[in-house]
Amino acid sequence: IAILLLVDTLLSVICLNLFKDKASLTSEKQSVKDDRLIEVLENNFKIGIYNDNSILDTTTVVYDLNKNEVGLSEILTDKPCLIIRFAETNCEECVRFLLIKVMRLYNSDLFNKRILLFASYPNRQALKILVDRLNIKYPVYLVDKLPISCERINFPYCFMLDSTMRTSHVFVPDKYEPQIANTYFELIENRYFK
């Protein structure tokens, strides 16, 4: 009987230690996830501070997919537009993530003219393939470079642009933290598109 009690006690101690190890591991994973989330939020806060209220040049020229020159002021409406900025050199998965997020939120002809895609693609054919594959309905323009510091990060980003060419709500989505992108687009939709 004493041996059975000893074996039972040992098994209980082993099970308790395994449970503690699993709980500790779960806690560590949650801590890493929380740290990552804080880092993404902190980076977007900094990006917003550095890039909000930048003013684009009113003489800026963009090109449609047929290489027709269009003045930026010609494509803006009297209401703020959501600009989706991406480049061929950006992480392809990140670009797709951003475009798919935008396409899910806005699907109205009324709003489609206020959502503009600004792409930097030396290979126009690659851009056309991307647009066709994702069945993008928004106007797409070729833009080499914009005069805001966000251009240097080499990730796709988005912002609101008003008729005075002033940027606001600059945001860089992170494919590993989709809930932040969801919140951003819900807030933008509620404020500007309803």
Q: Can you say where each PLM-predicted feature lies in the sequence?
A:
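Short, internal strand/loop/helix patches
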Residues: K128-L161
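Thiol-/selenol-based redox modules, centered on thioredoxin-like
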Residues: M160-K194
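Hydrophobic membrane-insertion alpha-helices, especially the h-region
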Residues: I1-N17
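Thiol-based oxidoreductase modules, predominantly thioredoxin-like and allied folds used
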Residues: R85, N112-A126, I136-K145
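Short acidic, S/G/P-rich loop/turn micro-motifs used as interaction or catalytic elements
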Residues: E88-C94, P122-R124, P173-Y176
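N-terminal "domain-start" segment that seeds a small globular fold
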Residues: T26-E74
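Short active-site neighborhood of thiol/selenol oxidoreductases, capturing the structured segment around
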Residues: V61-Y63, K67-L105, R114
